[in-house]
Amino acid sequence: TATVDCSGYPQSACPQDYVPFCGSDNKTYSNKCNFCNAVADSNGTLTLSHFGKC
């Protein structure tokens, strides 16, 4: 299972880089920062499905 270290999130501003992550909600997040912010907002219910677009 793919995992991401989201310690230090959420962050108030994310970079614009595009390195997609596919979440367990079947949504593509544009980069680690956006994905980890969503994980923080989900109280741990959101996980990484795989790296790359969904």
UniProtKB/Swiss-Prot annotation:
InterPro entries (alphabetical): Bifunctional_prot_inhibitor, Kazal_dom, Kazal_dom_sf, Prot_inh_Kazal-m
Pfam families: Kazal_1
Top-level lineage group: Eukaryota
Localisation per UniProt entry: Secreted
Transmembrane segments: none
Gene Ontology CC entries for this record: extracellular region
Site note Reactive bond 3, residues: Q16, D17
Keyword Disulfide bond: yes
UniProt KW Ion transport keyword: no
Bridged cysteine pairs (disulfide): C6-C36, C14-C33, C22-C54
The protein, known as: Ovomucoid
Source organism: Gallirallus australis
